[in-house]
Amino acid sequence: MSVSLQKGQKVNLSKDNAGLAKVIVGLGWDEAKPSGGGGGGFFATLFGGAATTHQAIDCDASAIMLKNGKFVDRTDLVYFGNLKHKSGTVNHMGDNLTGEGEGDDEQIVIDLSRVPAEYDKIVIVVNIYQAIHRKQHFRMIENAFIRLVDARTIKKCANII
């Protein structure tokens, strides 16, 4: 059964997906095309007037493992700077800096069957790297999604749009 969620909603995967052992969390996005054509036109480009400081929008997926509903230790955060949880049950598959390409741009693989018992929740979050410094926000991306897939059957469990 696939569930569609909106921002901030929660889903209990074990409730509706009996036997779910390993999930893939996939994050995808595309940079929105600037309205009005973008870089200032032909002459701006020709004479150096086009924007040259543009930085790609870098969305990042992270998994936070909670004990009794609380974040206790920074090693329980799995992200581009800590690709593997100490238990080996949560693995970030690498950082995509641009969102280019089709399908998942970043993935986190979670082996639910091996998560140590002291962890009661895993929270998935998405942020834009250095968003304030780069003056970027989520309205600057399009076609964004987070999907949870059963790694064994490749069946979608949840989709967040």
For the regions a language model picked out, list residue spans one by one:
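Intrinsic-disorder/low-complexity signal
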Residues: 1-161
